[in-house]
């Protein structure tokens, strides 16, 4: 094959603007410099051995061939029961729930099944980096609005809020899909009941559908509850709900999640899903179905991660980083612009590179979650780590 073919008009790129992600770059840099990786969002502690045993038992029971395209009955029923118990919405496990190869596949498949060339899709930045490429592959047009960056008396970003005026202007007759993410990555911001009601008012007389990315649903802190799109009956009737077993049960490498949606929407979703991945790992589905029977495994997560958040925040308070609120998810954003070092004037990407190579702690620039980087001096740490890992990272960060 001609090596120049990939660069020629005969083989045009479907995603010409997409390069290597910042997550890959920072993880590689962390490995090269033996830095503590608090950049990419994955745990460094093991999952529950009971879950491993459940998957092992499924393998020994010969659950090793193709499962149903939509996922095994037992797991879909477990998901339906969980959503009903937590959020009060009844999804039919036969027609309204599909097991996916992770949340990202669920997101892409949902977009591909409903977005046609020329359709507009509204996203709220900073945003998970899979949204735009999926929209591009569907031929849609991304319409991005930015979270409002609230600033303190010194002009530093101190929190984020939903940009309702911009969101109102962005939704029109061409809008096919609105993507929301709660709890939010990277900021940890959460949508409230009043926010969902306001969103319902915006889309009520439109043909816009909703994609609600809720992969951090079990990581909401300080006694608050996750407000799912499923808890709002009107919005649930036009929404894809996306979640992730990998995030919930500390098994991100398994790449398994689920999507729930009304029957008409799920029918179209499954048409794409069957040719996108066809189906998902069989023994892991059986293991998760068994593990899901005990709700304590996810009901205990808020306290589990809040303890890690509090430990990490307490350590960061011994530095000159300004801590932003972290009400949910397993991320902590900080502002570095008041550090008493020359590097405090660097761009977010350059600061993260310096932090990794010179201090030995990897982080992610929040600017990377925008198509056009917005510099606000804010970076993201992941605290889904062993206490020893966090302690070692804090020891290094406290030298700043």
Regions found by a protein language model. Give the residues of each.
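PLP-dependent class I/II
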Residues: 1-12, 16-19, 28-33, 40-58, ...
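Short, surface-exposed loop/turn segments at secondary-structure junctions
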Residues: 66-67, 299
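Conserved AMP-binding/adenylate-forming core of the ANL superfamily
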Residues: 75-79, 102
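Glycine-rich loop-to-alpha-helix module at the N-terminal edge of alpha/beta enzyme cores
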Residues: 38, 62-65, 78-85
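Short beta-strand to alpha-helix junction loop
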Residues: 70-71
């Amino acid at each position: 094959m001609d090596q120049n073919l990939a660069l020629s008009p005969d083989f045009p790129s479907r995603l010409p603007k997409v390069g290597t992600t910042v997550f890959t770059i920072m993880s590689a840099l962390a490995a090269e410099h033996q830095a503590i990786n608090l950049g990419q969002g994955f745990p460094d502690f093991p999952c529950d051995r009971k879950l491993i045993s459940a998957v092992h038992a499924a393998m020994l029971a010969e659950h090793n061939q193709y499962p149903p395209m939509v996922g095994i009955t037992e797991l879909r029923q477990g998901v339906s029961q969980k959503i009903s118990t937590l959020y009060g919405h009844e999804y039919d496990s036969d027609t309204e729930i599909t097991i996916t190869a992770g949340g990202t596949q669920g997101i892409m498949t949902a977009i591909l099944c409903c977005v046609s060339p020329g359709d507009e899709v509204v996203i709220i930045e900073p945003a998970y980096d899979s949204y735009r490429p999926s929209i591009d592959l569907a031929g849609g047009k991304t319409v991005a609005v930015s979270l409002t960056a609230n600033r303190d008396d010194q002009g530093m970003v101190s929190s984020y809020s939903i940009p309702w005026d911009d969101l109102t202007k962005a939704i029109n007759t061409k809008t096919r899909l609105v993507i929301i993410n709660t709890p939010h990555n990277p900021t940890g911001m959460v949508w409230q009941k009043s926010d969902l009601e306001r969103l319902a008012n915006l889309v009520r007389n439109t043909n816009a559908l909703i994609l609600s990315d809720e992969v951090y649903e079990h990581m909401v802190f300080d006694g608050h509850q996750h407000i799912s799109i499923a808890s709002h009956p009107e919005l649930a009737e036009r929404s894809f709900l996306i979640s992730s077993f990998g995030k919930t049960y500390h098994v991100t490498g398994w790449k398994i999640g689920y999507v729930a949606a009304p029957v008409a929407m799920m029918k179209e979703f499954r048409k794409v899903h069957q040719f996108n991945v066809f189906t998902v790992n069989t023994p892991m589905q059986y293991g998760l179905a068994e593990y899901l029977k005990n709700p304590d495994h996810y009901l205990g997560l808020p306290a589990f991660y809040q303890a890690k958040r509090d430990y990490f925040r307490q350590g960061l308070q011994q530095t000159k980083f300004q801590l932003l609120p972290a009400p949910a998810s397993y991320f902590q954003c900080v502002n570095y612009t008041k550090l008493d070092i020359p590097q405090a004037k660097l761009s977010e990407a350059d600061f993260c590179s310096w932090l990794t190579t010179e201090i030995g702690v990897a982080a992610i620039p929040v600017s990377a979650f925008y198509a056009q980087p917005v510099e606000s001096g804010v970076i993201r740490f992941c605290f889904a780590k062993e206490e020893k890992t966090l302690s070692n990272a804090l020891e290094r960060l406290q030298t700043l």
